[in-house]
């Protein structure tokens, strides 16, 4: 139909409305053409349950406008899951079930790079040193397993092997992950020939994971081959010729600067501090006062230039502090060619640390420096500077935070429950040892609107008050003089939520009555003729049901305050948060509809309401969706049946996120074996172009029956939850067709309600290529003798849920019973038609296009009629010239006759019927107007009147010609017998005065008065 409509051509209409009419027709045809080309597919799928097991945090995700996915059908279903937290202890399982069948598979490991092999562990690698020197040729890398903790003694943790690649060769070293922390440090010594004396080179670091081995250390030998592309990158490390000095410079005043080492010192270690002096310093005496706590001593003061300065050292011991006084005297002058502002080394002060530091914990030793000049107060506070020395028995190299996850999905605004990520702080020693120092650190979040940190610095969290998300948000940690930063990605929901309903208008289902209090039109009391009818009177019409899903996009804002968002998975992906917000979702008007289990909307009575989700923190509305329940009636057109004889499952990894997993399950429908159990998946197709799985409806409201053409081919199945199932006792090589019918439940299946609402057919096994599968009937039809299993029937069988299952042989039906049930079906249809309340139906896009085309044709017809009326009115205004004399008389036809026969006039007058006698009058030629000539009056109504005027003028020197004007009046309805047929009626036009007709008399040659008088009498007699 669409092709014919789109391809039809019409002639271009004329008139001023023609172009507009063509445009309207073109638009209407285009609407119909687009609708035909974009007919959507039915959103059907196999309603099997897909769930993740042993996954700490995961979400179902879907693309916008793609649910179910395009590859779903009655026999298959696809779902995409997003796993956020890693699973280092146990691999999660994905289970697919459709009772009584179930299967499960292990989720494949993550793939961090497209070319890499999947690994079962999620590892974070941190390089401790950015550069190494020949004095310290060790490259240290910390490996951390993200996820939960492990109990002590866990023997399943793997080994991490570090690979260093240099143009001069390769080096390898491994470590085994330690329980509790789930971390280890590889300390790889780089060969000395890799270092260059003149330039800086670079070595690339990568790692691989391998199972732990027996023996010391738990890892294999270091003799490893090149890992190739399977190695995961760590980064690079610089190989420098010498160790750059690590120190800090602090000015004591405008002329003197203090340079101190910037590294922890160990007990018993000797170190020095240096004083720098500007060349423009002119004082000859300088005193330096140093105060130290117990455990630290000043051993010596040495001038850097003994020829210019001398130093004297004095020590004073106190109860809490030791004071050292160094007096410097100038011994010579500075060289004149040096720059005045240039700094030069002036004095070296040596310190030593005592061996005992308090049990291996790093401590600080404050050192107070103060300059004194002659004439200055000795305790001037403005010249004091305090320097803290970190003293530790361990060679601490770095402070590193260990987080269980590097990204956080902020669902706290939806649930009101804070989300936490545990954090631990460890120090890395020179020998590769790890020590936790979480209790001693300080911390601060760089952006509290995105992420917060706990007071104990052992976790970062979101509480629901955060306003946005971000990528790479920073949290700073510090311990003594060591600092470290942790960067995480926080995904925040974009509100409002999207609430998707499978049907936003719920209507009554014609003929489907269920037990319970009346929620729709009440049944008439006259139907209660017996006990069964009284029970059926308590039934009411079933309303449609709709599935509901709550979705939300998650995004991260840029840290620089820009507006460009980064979406989780992509801008067209949504996370299913139904399991989180279902406790906070409700129907605004519970009388109109109700929400069952947070997943199914049930219509109660006609009305308009909405489904809304309120925030548990502020009671604000997070999302809202309108819902209408009408007393319009729809019919169940057919049952779409899919037999399930087993479940198969496949899993695949996605590319948008490392935790993306897509699961697809199929229903196995091979030829059933004897005693094969078969489950039936049912979809209800309604007349309002919607479909719904039978799982949306209460099992007690479904009266289902299954029949087979072969007697004894099927038996009732055991309990299967919400699914309908049978046991096939045997099937031929070509398969077995099953007929499924939907009935009202048994208490409401009385009298006129015994006819099936709809039926469908399923084929067990693959149908032959030459014999197509039976079509799904749209109306109930009785099958030939067969075997039938009924659900919700009268017979009770253990194992059914909601309705009971029975088995009966259906070998023959009486004609009387069939006719009776057909009559009841017709009565039911008539009654339901009377119960229907006129209401606007759902209009599809195709119907809209047809209505638009019909409207265009109506407009064209209207324009044609208007043009016709305008045409008629326009030409009615144009009147003939002689209509002014008598506008009511019909317009005669004027004929002109030319001739030379003078007797023609007499011949015409003889044909005229004689009129009534006229009075005598004088000749107009003589009287000159003394009397009035008779005037020609119109004839009686319906009569025939003709008038002729003959005009002849005399031609010079020749024969006169005549011009005769003959006027024919409309023909009479019937001619008189005496009048000859075909004789024209002629009347002469006479005038009253002599002046008017004198020239006529002269032209006719009548000059004698007697001739004129006779002529006039003849004229009067003829008129």
Swiss-Prot record:
Biological process annotations from GO: negative regulation of protein catabolic process; positive regulation of Wnt protein secretion; positive regulation of Wnt signaling pathway
Domain of life the protein comes from: Eukaryota
Residues spanning the signal sequence: 1-35
Region feature (Binds to HSPA5/GRP78): 611-916
Glycosylation, residue list: 280
Biased composition (Acidic residues): 824-836
Family matches, as PANTHER family: DETONATOR, ISOFORM E, TRANSMEMBRANE PROTEIN 132A
Family under the similarity heading: Belongs to the TMEM132 family.
Function text: May play a role in embryonic and postnatal development of the brain. Increased resistance to cell death induced by serum starvation in cultured cells. Regulates cAMP-induced GFAP gene expression via STAT3 phosphorylation.
Protein name, UniProt field: Transmembrane protein 132A
Organism: Homo sapiens
């Amino acid at each position: 139909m669409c092709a014919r409509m789109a391809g039809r051509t019409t002639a271009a209409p004329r008139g001023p409305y023609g172009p507009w009419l063509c445009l309207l027709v073109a638009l209407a045809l285009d609407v119909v053409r687009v609708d035909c080309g974009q007919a959507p597919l039915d959103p059907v799928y196999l309603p099997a349950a897909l769930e993740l097991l042993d996954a700490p945090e995961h979400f179902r995700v879907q693309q916008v406008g793609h649910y179910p996915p395009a590859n779903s059908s009655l026999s298959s279903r696809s779902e995409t899951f997003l796993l956020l937290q890693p699973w280092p202890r146990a691999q999660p399982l994905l289970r697919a079930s459709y009772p009584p069948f179930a299967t499960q598979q292990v989720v494949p490991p993550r793939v961090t790079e497209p070319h890499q092999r999947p690994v079962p562990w999620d590892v974070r690698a941190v390089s401790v040193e950015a550069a190494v020197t020949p004095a310290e040729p060790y490259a240290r890398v910390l490996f951390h397993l993200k996820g939960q903790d492990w109990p002590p003694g866990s023997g399943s943790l793997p080994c991490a092997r570090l690979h260093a690649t240099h143009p001069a060769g390769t080096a390898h070293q491994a470590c085994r992950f330690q329980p509790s922390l789930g971390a280890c440090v590889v300390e790889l010594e780089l060969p000395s020939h890799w270092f260059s004396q003149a330039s800086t080179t670079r070595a690339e670091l990568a790692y691989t994971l391998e199972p732990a081995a027996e023996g010391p250390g738990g890892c294999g030998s270091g003799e490893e081959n090149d890992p190739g592309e399977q190695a995961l990158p760590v980064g690079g490390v610089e190989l420098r010729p010498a160790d750059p000095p690590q120190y800090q410079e602090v000015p004591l005043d405008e002329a003197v600067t203090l340079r101190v080492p910037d590294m922890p010192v160990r007990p018993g270690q000797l170190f020095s501090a240096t004083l720098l002096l500007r060349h423009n310093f002119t004082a000859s005496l300088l005193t330096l006062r140093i105060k130290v706590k117990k455990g630290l001593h000043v051993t010596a003061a040495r001038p850097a230039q003994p020829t210019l300065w001398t130093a004297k050292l004095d020590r004073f011991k106190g109860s809490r502090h030791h004071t050292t006084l160094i007096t410097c005297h100038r011994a010579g002058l500075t060289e004149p060619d040096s720059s005045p502002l240039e700094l030069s080394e002036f004095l070296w002060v040596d310190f030593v640390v005592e061996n005992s530091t308090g049990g291996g914990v790093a401590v600080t030793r404050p050192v107070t420096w103060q300059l004194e000049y002659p004439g200055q107060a000795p305790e001037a506070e403005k010249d004091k500077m305090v320097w803290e020395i970190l003293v530790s028995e361990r060679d601490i190299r770095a402070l590193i935070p260990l987080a269980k996850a590097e990204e956080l999905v902020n669902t706290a605004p939806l649930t009101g429950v804070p989300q936490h990520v545990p954090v631990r702080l460890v120090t890395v020693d020179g020998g590769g040892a790890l020590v936790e120092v979480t209790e001693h650190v300080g911390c601060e979040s760089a952006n509290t609107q995105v992420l917060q940190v706990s007071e104990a610095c052992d976790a970062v969290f979101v509480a629901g008050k955060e306003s946005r998300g971000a990528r790479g948000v920073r949290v700073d940690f510090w311990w003594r003089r060591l600092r470290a930063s942790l960067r995480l990605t926080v995904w925040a929901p974009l509100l409002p939520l999207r609430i998707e309903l499978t049907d936003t208008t719920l209507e009554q289902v014609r003929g489907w009555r269920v037990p319970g209090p009346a929620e729709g039109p009440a049944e008439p009391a006259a139907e209660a003729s017996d006990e069964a009818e009284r029970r059926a009177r308590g039934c009411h019409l079933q309303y449609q049901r709709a599935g509901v899903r709550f979705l939300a996009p998650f995004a991260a804002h840029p840290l620089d305050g820009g507006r460009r968002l980064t979406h989780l998975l992509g801008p067209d992906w949504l996370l299913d948060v139904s399991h989180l917000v279902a406790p906070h979702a409700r129907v605004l008007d519970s009388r109109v509809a109700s929400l069952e289990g947070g997943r199914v909307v049930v219509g109660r009575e006609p009305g308009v309401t909405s489904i809304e989700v309120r925030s548990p923190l502020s009671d604000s509305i997070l999302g809202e969706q309108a819902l209408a329940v009408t007393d319009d009636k729809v019919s169940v057109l057919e049952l779409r049946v899919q037999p399930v004889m087993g479940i198969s499952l496949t899993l695949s990894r996605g590319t948008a996120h490392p935790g993306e997993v897509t699961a697809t399950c199929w229903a196995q429908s091979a030829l059933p074996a004897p005693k094969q159990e078969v489950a039936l998946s049912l979809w209800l197709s309604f007349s309002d172009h919607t479909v719904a799985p039978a799982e949306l409806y209460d099992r007690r409201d479904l009266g289902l029956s299954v029949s087979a053409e072969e007697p004894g081919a099927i038996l009732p199945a055991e309990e299967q939850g919400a699914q309908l199932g049978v046991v096939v006792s045997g099937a031929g090589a070509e398969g077995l067709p099953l007929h499924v019918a939907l009935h009202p439940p048994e208490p409401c299946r009385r009298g006129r309600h015994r006819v099936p609402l709809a039926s469908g057919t399923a084929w067990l096994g693959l149908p032959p290529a030459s014999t197509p599968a039976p079509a799904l009937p749209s109306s109930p039809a009785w099958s030939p003798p067969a075997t039938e299993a009924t659900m919700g029937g009268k017979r009770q069988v253990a194992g059914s849920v909601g309705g009971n299952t029975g088995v009966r042989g259906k070998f023959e039906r009486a004609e009387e019973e069939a006719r009776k049930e057909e009559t009841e079906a017709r009565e039911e249809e008539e009654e339901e038609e009377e119960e229907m309340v006129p209401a606007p139906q759902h209009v599809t896009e195709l119907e809209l296009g047809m209505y638009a085309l019909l409207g265009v044709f109506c407009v064209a017809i209207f324009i044609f009629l208007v043009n016709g009326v305008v045409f008629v009115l326009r030409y009615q205004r144009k009147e003939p010239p002689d209509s002014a004399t008598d506008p009511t008389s019909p317009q005669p036809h004027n004929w002109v006759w030319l001739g030379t026969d003078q007797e023609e006039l007499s011949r015409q007058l003889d044909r005229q019927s004689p009129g009534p006698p006229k009075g005598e009058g004088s000749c107009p030629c003589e009287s000159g107007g003394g009397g009035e000539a008779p005037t020609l009056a119109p004839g009686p109504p319906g009569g025939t009147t003709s008038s002729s005027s003959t005009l002849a003028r005399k031609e010079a020197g020749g024969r006169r010609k005549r011009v005769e004007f003959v006027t024919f009046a409309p023909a009479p309805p019937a001619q008189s017998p005496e009048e000859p047929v075909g004789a024209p009626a002629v009347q002469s036009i006479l005038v009253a005065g002599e002046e008017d007709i004198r020239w006529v008399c002269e032209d006719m040659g009548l000059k004698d008065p007697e001739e004129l008088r006779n002529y006039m009498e003849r004229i009067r007699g003829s008129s």
